Amino acid sequence: DETVINILKQNNVELIAMRCAGYNNVDLTAADKAGIKIVRVPAYSPNAVAEHAVAILLALTRHIPQAYLRTKTGNFTLTGLTGRNLNGLTAGILGTGKIGQIMAELLAGFGMKIILYDLYPNKFWATQHNFEYVPLEDLFKKK
């Protein structure tokens, strides 16, 4: 925020290098006013981000956190731990930039049907992968 930017300026900071893709957590107006340049990594490992999202999806659909906590306490029962198969389910991808495209391709590898929404659709890419762009309302309605 502006207070932090001003403290940095008082300490002769001229540049803030962000280890992320976006600027959403920096007061750009305050930084500009203080003469501090902001730089970022615009392609911050889109594969790692998409793969991490898939790992979280798998952990949740397979109840891995719950299974881990149970086994830690010596409880090896399977009740309530039966997971769901991703194969045959529909995945809705909101935004088909680099991360969204990689995520869609990874999930398609599990046999999921992929539907997409983006203000600026990449229809050529979607057609290549047999993915379908749908209106935003439909993305949230599909099961």
Residue ranges of each PLM-predicted region?
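Phosphate/diphosphate ligand-binding glycine-rich loop within oxidoreductases
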Residues: 1-68, 83
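Alpha-helix boundary recognition
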Residues: 9, 32, 72, 87, ...
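Residue-level detector of flexible, active-site-proximal loop/helix-junction positions
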Residues: 23, 45, 71, 121, ...
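Generic structural signal for helix capping and beta-alpha/helix-loop junctions
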Residues: 25-26, 48, 74, 101, ...
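Conserved hydrophobic/aromatic pocket- or pore-lining residues that grip, position, or stack substrates
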Residues: 31, 53, 74, 95, ...
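Generic structural signal for alpha-helix termini and adjacent loop/cap motifs
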Residues: 60-63, 74, 142
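A short, charged, Gly/Pro-tolerant segment at domain boundaries
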Residues: 70-78
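Rossmann-like dinucleotide/phosphate-binding beta-alpha-beta segment
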Residues: 79-143
